[in-house]
């Protein structure tokens, strides 16, 4: 019965009579191919069956990506189920004979048959390593290599270069997916070696394919459609795209970052309209692909012409800006490619050493829904902080007024409210930025110094109030005072009473706070500031006040007070310590 069914299938596939292939007939023949081909016992019969399949109208009538999966299923069944029929080596020998005997020009369907075989190589390798299913001493593995390099690559290039492909988007997509499915990180160079095609065009079309996929990412996907196949193979698309990028010219690279920025912008808008539970692995995989593509583009920066570099890096920056919503949700821990792209980006803007060009990028981000999108806001603030921190003394008041000052009035920062995790991150990021800008060397700009004077005491008071209200931690308030206390003396020329006022505001809060632990932390903030008093009379006065505030049993605070006093290199302060503190301690023994 089995042999009769196989012969019937061979006859059906070999028929030159025009058959009306409806969906039912296609499904029936497909099921028979998957069932019978792996089970045939005779090499001669298998040769006739595979040959009939390879030259049949049936494979032409099938959607190419479905055909690929049918052939893939045939080989996976043969490899995984290990039917007690033909040995693996003879099974592959027959397929090789069919491929080599075909002298006519290959069509798209025949290439998809070959691709369906080739995509099973990882499974073959894994199973053979584990169970030694191939007794041919590596000959079967060699078939895979030869089929890929000697058949698939040149035939794929030949089809890609034909006029019909350039005019048919559907065929383009099938060929691109067929190519991408064979890519992984280890075989990138070998697969493309000697392939005579325009890699500029391939890169362009791969990005078009990605863009189309992203536009339909939330829509239901029809089985064996382009989007459906891509959804489970974006890692292969990433390897293919990054390989193609390395073979593309400068104009294509610049156009590629423009396309990626557009894709990222659309992705950001899509994610913003979805609920948390709708963000499945498809979004994570797209995010990873985009970052890998940006990494490859960043690595090609030396090929970008000087007059295009600003645009090139601006597009990379905006791409990261748009997808920061996914960065927040997915995270970048264990993903060094993201750090590479971001660090490379920041390094460019630093090495460029031209703040006016950076303001263009900042303006684009600022106008791009930053206030309404907290994820974009986080990226914007952190990037702004990096730039401000580096350019430091070259920052001028218009820059502060335009980009930094508005952030200091955000409710999440000014009120210190603790909402969701994102609110907390925004608040902490603005605090970091505020410390950075208030720490700029004021000697380079009197306008910046005057702005710092107008802001620093307000900020310190606000920070202490937020700490007392439980909206800032002890470590955070100590960090703030540790950084900004050093700035108070340099602003003395613009406000002679700034340090005095800061000490007074700190003292008032120490006296009024009821929580003893918070009181001790604020005393630490006071100690930090006392170190910068220049007037000897005022110094001793504040040392006495500080000592009165400290509980005599609090060894930690006394130790910190001593460390501060000893660091002053002031004989007056040292004398005060020995005559006031130590004598007081001795009298209580």
UniProtKB/Swiss-Prot annotation:
GO cellular component term, pick one: peroxisomal matrix
Localization of this protein: Peroxisome matrix
Record carries keyword Secreted: no
Record's keyword terms, sorted: Peroxisome, Peroxisome biogenesis
Residue span of motif Microbody targeting signal: 587-589
Known role: Required for peroxisome assembly.
Protein name from the UniProt record: Peroxisomal biogenesis factor 8
Native source species: Saccharomyces cerevisiae (strain ATCC 204508 / S288c)
